Amino acid sequence: MLPSLRRAVCSAAVLLVPLAAPRLAAQPAAGALLTCREVPGWPRLAAGDTLGMVSGVAVDPAGHVVAFRRAGRRWESDTLDMTPIARPTVLVLDAGSGAVLRAWGAGQFAMPHGLTVDRAGNVWLTDVALNQVYKFSATGQRLLTLGERGVPGRDAAHFDMPTGVAVAEDGSFYVSDGYGNARVLHFAADGRLLRQWGDSGAGPGQFRLVHGVALGPEGRVYVADRENERVQLFDTAGRFVGEWRSDALGKPFALVGGPAGTPWAGAWLVADGGRGDYFDDARARSGVVVVAPDGAIRARFAELGRDALAPLRPHALAVGGDGAVYVAGLRLAKFICR
């Protein structure tokens, strides 16, 4: 795990302007240059505690970091363990120190996947083993459950390994569904299905593993179409608007818009699983890709041997109000970019 790198802070230059050649996205052209550094020793867990893989991360309205961990549970290739994880799976962390402020979710989830925190501080979670989508209060009280526990399906009452949730200002929400299905569903705030779209394939509005969903300020729905190696854009009615595709973008696992007032304002950050074998650090070329609104690749960081202190394999990401970037994957990391 590269112990020599754990004792140092690695850095990389990140350019926040479109580049002439997207394949060379790590090389500067003109404009302001940022340096991204992973914060060593973050997060800070209690003695004897371990994260395991962290599948989701978000920043809540109070500025705390909320993480969804698997706590040692492994996703085997041929089956999913349906036994609830005994340890707390949702951790609320101090953004500065990385200390755990509170933890909940013990005995409730079998294979954590997506995590979103809405403007009211509610926590939305998906479990790909249980085929369910949940809404919790900030303190862990369950407010809404969608899907039949452990039962996959394609109708309005079932999911097949749902991967993520995006919540609109009006309280309605979108679900990416997922590993078994190839669709996006739009629900009213009370859980009524409003519409859905998508099927399997590589054409516009078709998907090969819908791995995440996000909403843009202009009213567009952004979908991480992982195995088609692209991000698709739709209007709120599900009509195809366009796509992001580039030699510099591999498999998009998740994406988040840059908050106003941060260096990332107006840009998108994409958790890129790279190409080749996701579990082969030497081949995957995984990292975080910075994308302009028009789809131009601006930069990339969080790469092993460049600015990540240990293997990371980004699976999800979030941006704090101060511009700090939190990357979840094999572990949880914090990057400061200035």
Language-model-derived ranges and their functions:
Residues M1-A12, A20-A21:
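Bacterial N-terminal signal peptides that target proteins for export
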